[in-house]
Amino acid sequence: MVRGKDDEETVTKKFLEWAGDLPMVAHNAKFDISFIEMAMKKYNLGTFKNTVIDTLELSRTLDQGFARHGLSALVKRYNVPWEEDAHHRADYDAEGTAKVFSKMLQKLTSQNYNTIADLTKLVSTAEIHKFGRTYHFNAIALNKTGLKNLFKIISLANTTYLYKTPRILRSKLNELREGLLIGSGCYESEIFIEARSKEGQELTNLINFYDYVEVQPPEVYNHLIQTSDFKNEEELRKHIEKIINATKEAGKLIVATGDVHHFEKEDKIYREIIVNQKVPGGGRHPLAKSNITNIPSQHFRTTKEMLNDFNFLDESLAYEIVVTNTNKVLDMVEDIEVIIDTGGIPFSPRVKSDDGTQYLDCPSVVTELVYTKAASWYGENLPYNIEERIAKELYGDIVYKCCYQNAKENNPDLEEDKIIELTFESLHNIILQGFDKVKELIGEHIEKTWNEEDGVLDEETKKKKIKKELGGIIGGGFDPIYLISQRLVKHSNDEGYLVGSRGSVGSSFVATMMGITEVNPLPAHYRCTKCSHSIFKDDDGKELGATYSSGFDLPDKMCPVCGERLYKDGQDMPFATFLGFNADKVPDIDLNFSDLNQASAHEYTKVLFGVDNVYRAGTIGTVAEKTAFGFVKGYFEDKGITNKRTCEIERLAKGCTGVKRTTGQHPGGIVVVPDYMEVSDFTPFQFPADDPNSAWRTTHFDYHAIDQDLLKLDILGHSDPTQLRMIQDMTGTDILAVPLDDKDTMSIFTSTKALGVTKEQIMNETGTLGIPEFGTPFTIGMVAETKPTTFAELIKISGL
C-alpha cells in the first residue's frame, strides 16, 4: 500500500477497465498474470479471460537457435536500448518488453504469421514438449505393474520427449499412472514454485494431480535465500507451512522428504566439488551460481534430525509428516523384484525364418545344420567319437547313457562291441527325431529308475526331473543363441567378410559344424575333403591326438580310399572349456567381425528381431580417480585455496571417484529382448550420452545388471578380418585355401630368410614384425627365446 494512493482493489479495477478485452503481452507472463488472477479472485472481479502473449515462450519458439531467452538477452538480440541497472522496475521492464515484442512482430510478419491464431502454428504438435514449463516430480512403483510403467515413463522421457533434459508430458504420465505414486518433488516442483503465487482452489487443483506432496527441511532450500528467491528463513518457513496447509485442505498426503543427494553430512564436500564442475555436454549445475556460496546439505537425515528440522511446526504435525505419513507411503509399496531372477539363464529370443513368416524350431534347425555338415566332412556313418561328441554337446551325457542302458537291457547276451554299435545307432536316430523324442527317452529312463521312496511320480514331477537331467546346448535352452550366431556369421560371410571367433567357442564342435567358428575342437586327425574318410589313429592304433596337440602339425598323408591328399585338422579342445563340466554354463559367443562390416552386422539384428527388440548394451561412465584429483584441485583453485596437502586432495578425490558422469554403450554388445516380452519388463532405454541423433538406443541400466536376464550378442569389430579381406582382394587367393602347415611360413618365427631380408635390415631376429599380436616387444622377445616350430607351440605362446 502506497500512502496517498489508490488501494489494491481500486487499482485492479482501473487496470482491467483500461485493458478491456485486448491481448496482453508480458515477459514470463505466467508469473505476472498470476497476481492479476489472485487480485480478481480476492475482490470478486470475475475470471481473467484476456489472450496473453508471453515474449519468453515466444522467443523460445521463434529463436530456437539461441540458448538464452531472458529479457536482458532479448533486448540485445533485437537491438532495443536498455540500461541493465534499471532492470526489474515494472515500468522499465514493460517498456522494454513492448519494444522487443514490436521487433518480434516484424519478424513474425516476414515469416507470414499475421494473426494470434497463426502463433499456434509456430510449433508442431510433435515438438510442443520442447517449449512448455517443466517441473520435477517423484514416482514410486507400488507393484510390478507400476515398475513396468515407471520404466516406460523413463524410456519416453529419455527418447521421445528428450530435449536438453529428460521430460514427460503430463498427459502421458496420466496414461501410465497405474501402479505408481506420484510425488510433488523438490524445490523445482510445480507445487513449490506455483504456491508462491497461487492460493485457494487454484492451488488445490494443482495439488490434486499428485498422490502425495513433499516438503523438505528449510536447510535443503537454503540456497533460495542466497539467490533472493526468499528474503529470509522465516519467509521460507511460511511458504512450507502454506504448502502443508493447502495439501491437508485438499485431502492429500503431505510427506517430509530429504531430497537426498549424499549419505553423511560430512559428504557434502564431495557434492560441492562435483557441483563445481562443468556438466558433460555443456552448461553448469543449477547450484553452481555465483550468488550461492554455500550449497545445502542434502544428506540422508535420521528421523530425529528430520523432526528437529521441522521444529517450527506444531509437534504433532511434524511427527505426522515425518513419521506417520512416510510409513503410510511405505505400507502401500509391495516387495518388488526389479531384476528378474532367472537362475542365470537369460530369456531366449525366438528366431524367425529368412522370409520372416514363421518362427523356427531351433532344436530341429540346429540338429539338421550340425548333422548335415558333419556328414559332408566325416561321412554319413559318423565315427563314434564324433557321434558321442555331438550328443554330449547338444544334450549332455544323459542321452548316451540312456541309449547304452537300453541296448544292454534289451540285449543281455551280446558282446560289448555289439552293445556299443547298437548304442550309437540308437543315439543317432533319437537325436535326429528331435527334442521331443529325446525327452521321451529320458522320461522312460526316469520311470524305470524311480523308487517308491522318491515319492509319487506324477507328470509335473517327471517334467522337472527331465529338465534337471538335460544339459548341453539344446537341453539347456541355448540353441537359439547358437542359431542367432550362425545367422550373423553367415550374413557377414555372404557380404564377403570372414568372422573370427574369440575365446572358448572354438571348443564347441557344434559351433564348428554350424559355421560359427573355423576352429575344429576334435583331437588331431585327418579327413578327406573328397570322400569324407577320416583317420584318428596311427598305424599302431595309437590316437593321433596323444602325439600331436594340433592337427595342423600332422605329417602329410594321402587318403587310403580315394588317393586324395588328406586335410589335417583338430585342435583337441574339450567342450567343458566352453559350456562347463556339466554343460550348463550360459554360452558366451564372442565374434570378431570386420570393422568395415560391424555396423552392417549390428543392423542385421534389427532384421532378425525387430527394431524394438534390440538395444545396445548400456554403460555408465563414472568419474575416474585421476579426473577426480583434477576436480578437487580445480575446486580449491576456484576458492583461492592453495595450501592443501596432496594427501588431503587424494582423500577428497577418493570420495568423488565412481560418481556417475555420463552414459555410453558397449562397443559391440547388442541386448536382445524376446518378442514375447517387452523391454519394460527388464529395463528402461535411452540414447547413449543423451544424444537424440544416435542410430541406436541403449539399455538405461548398465548391461551387467541385466546380463542374466537378457541375451547379449557380442558383435565386436576387429581389423584382422578386414586385413584378410584386403589381402584376398589384392592377391586373388582364397584365404580359406591357404595351407596352415606351410614350412616357409612357420620359419618366419625363427628366421627372416623366407622373407628375403636379413635381420639387420628389419632390425629384428625373426620375421614376425608385421604379424598381428606377434609384433610387440614382449612377444618378439618371447618368440626369439622359445623358437616355435609347430602350430601347437604358436597356440601356447598366444595363450600367454
Which stretches of residues belong to each language-model region?
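Conserved non-catalytic scaffold segment of RNase H-like nuclease domains
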Residues: 1-49, 64-78, 84, 88
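Short glycine-rich phosphate-binding loop at a beta-alpha junction
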Residues: 23-29, 255, 498-500
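Short alpha-helix plus adjacent loop in nuclease-associated cores
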Residues: 41, 52-73, 137-140, 266-278, ...
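Conserved beta-strand -> loop -> alpha-helix junction used to position metal-binding or nucleic-acid-contacting
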Residues: 46-60, 118, 182
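Acidic, divalent-metal-coordinating active-site segment for phosphoryl/phosphodiester hydrolysis
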Residues: 89-102
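Mg2+-dependent phosphoryl-transfer active-site scaffold
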Residues: 106-376, 405, 418, 488, ...
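Helix-hairpin-helix/helix-loop-helix acidic hairpins
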Residues: 212-239, 372-499, 646-651, 657-660
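Catalytic DNA-binding helix-loop module of base-excision-repair DNA glycosylases/AP lyases
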Residues: 491-493, 504-516
